[in-house]
């Protein structure tokens, strides 16, 4: 149940921000034509009303996909407004400071408000705020079209002691399907077709098959059961797979949901690794594959994984690949306690589904929370690869950080 006092305060704050921004926009558009001013006014207040209405009515929206989009548009607009308001506020503080200095020095405050040449800086800052905020909002809307824009990321990885028969062995790594968020079967099928086209020897999935409930997979079994490989498909659980974010009627109901999800993995033909290890064999040689339940160094995420149990009986002289959903596990436990684990595969972060990335540079706000958040990381002897996620959660889109299918070739 939502707190009415909190909702009331939130609405009042947002309405105050709405009018504050509108006053600045009116000032900026004084020299524009009537048509432009009317169009901006209609667009601005339409978005404000949608946002405020979504906050009031969100519990009554029953369609999960409509909820996704209305939530994303509303949150995007609120973030956009905060960016604008922050820049406008900085400018107002600057202007107020100059005015106060002018008063104290008995000078005209106006002389402090303009640059000697060109645009008055207050106008520049105001347009800067509008430009930054508009770019952000437009990029979020554009990102709706990227949620199924799957890409293959190819990595060649060397493992010490790898038997020669595994040279050129191809592994597909996927993570974070979040089936409860998926909507378009044809689009998802294209992602599955991309996986199949790589002809992998082995497929590895590192958790978060669902958002909360095993039933989310009911309409997707025919799609994901197509994911197969000669040496099998192996999977593990992520934080969302346990149903921890749902209020269950009983503990038994929650446990039944987990049991049902484990059966979903089995019905897909995927071998779910629950704090255990298996041998991946070829022509009499093998390496070890270890999979654990979710283990996070972050306090708000669960530590169900038991790596000590999972490593039982392993020959440390052979390569070990670990499946562990949360990349924070790598520095917190794997590096200090298990130097024999040469490669860990993770997901979880999604790259926040928002950022900038090119061959020379990558950035996302998620890096302020996760040191290892996308791609390859390594120490002298150990490696971590963080998959950017196949699906999406919350925001039904991706900006800059596209959904990923990782193709690993052992060399």
What residue spans do the PLM features occupy?
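Non-catalytic terminal accessory segments
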Residues: 1-148
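Arginine residue identity/basic-tract feature
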Residues: 2, 37, 41, 67, ...
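Short, charge-rich amphipathic segments
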Residues: 17-30, 116-131, 154-163, 189-203, ...
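Acidic, His/Gly-rich catalytic cores of divalent-metal-dependent hydrolytic chemistry
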Residues: 18-23, 31, 52-66, 149, ...
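C-terminal segment of N-terminal export signals and the immediately downstream linker at the start
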Residues: 101-104, 135-172, 182-186, 190-193
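A short, flexible N-terminal coil/short beta segment enriched in small residues
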Residues: 119, 125-128, 136-155, 256-275
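Soluble catalytic domains of enzymes that build or remodel membrane lipids, polysaccharides, and related
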Residues: 162-411
């Amino acid at each position: 149940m939502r707190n009415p006092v909190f909702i009331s305060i939130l609405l009042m704050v947002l309405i105050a921000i709405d009018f504050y921004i509108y006053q600045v926009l009116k000032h900026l558009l004084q020299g524009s034509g009537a048509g432009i001013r009317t169009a901006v006014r209609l667009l601005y207040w339409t978005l404000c009303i949608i946002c405020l209405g979504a906050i009031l009515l969100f519990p009554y929206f029953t369609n999960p996909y409509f909820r996704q989009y209305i939530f994303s548009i509303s949150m995007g607009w609120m973030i956009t407004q905060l960016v604008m308001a922050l820049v406008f506020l900085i400018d107002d503080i600057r202007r107020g400071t100059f005015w106060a200095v002018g008063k104290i020095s008995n000078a005209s405050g106006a002389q402090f408000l303009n640059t000697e040449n060109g645009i008055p800086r207050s106008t520049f800052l105001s347009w800067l705020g509008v430009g930054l905020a508009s770019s952000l909002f437009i990029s979020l809307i554009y990102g709706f079209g990227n949620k199924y824009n799957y890409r293959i990321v190819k990595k060649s990885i060397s493992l010490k002691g790898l038997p020669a028969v595994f040279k050129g062995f191809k592994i597909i790594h996927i993570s974070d399907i979040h089936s409860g968020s998926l909507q378009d079967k044809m689009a998802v099928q294209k992602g599955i077709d991309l996986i199949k086209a790589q002809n992998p020897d082995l497929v590895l999935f590192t958790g978060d098959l669902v958002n909360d409930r095993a039933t989310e997979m009911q309409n997707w079994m025919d799609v994901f059961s197509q994911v197969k490989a000669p040496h099998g498909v192996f999977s593990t659980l992520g934080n969302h797979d346990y149903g921890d974010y749902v209020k269950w009627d009983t503990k038994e109901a929650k446990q039944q949901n987990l049991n049902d999800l484990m059966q979903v993995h089995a019905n897909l033909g995927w071998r779910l690794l629950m704090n255990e290890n298996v041998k991946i064999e070829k022509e009499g040689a093998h390496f070890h594959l270890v999979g654990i339940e979710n283990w996070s160094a972050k306090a708000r995420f669960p530590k169900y994984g038991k790596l000590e149990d999972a490593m039982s009986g392993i020959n440390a002289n052979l390569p070990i690949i670990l499946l562990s959903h949360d990349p924070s596990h790598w520095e917190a436990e794997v590096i200090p306690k298990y130097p024999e684990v040469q490669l860990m595969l993770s997901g979880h972060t999604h790259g926040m589904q928002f950022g900038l990335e090119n061959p020379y540079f990558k950035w996302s706000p998620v890096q302020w929370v996760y040191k290892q958040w996308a791609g390859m990381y390594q120490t002298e002897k150990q490696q971590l690869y963080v998959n950017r996620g196949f699906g999406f959660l919350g925001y039904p889109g991706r900006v800059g950080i596209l959904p990923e299918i990782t193709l690993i070739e052992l060399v």
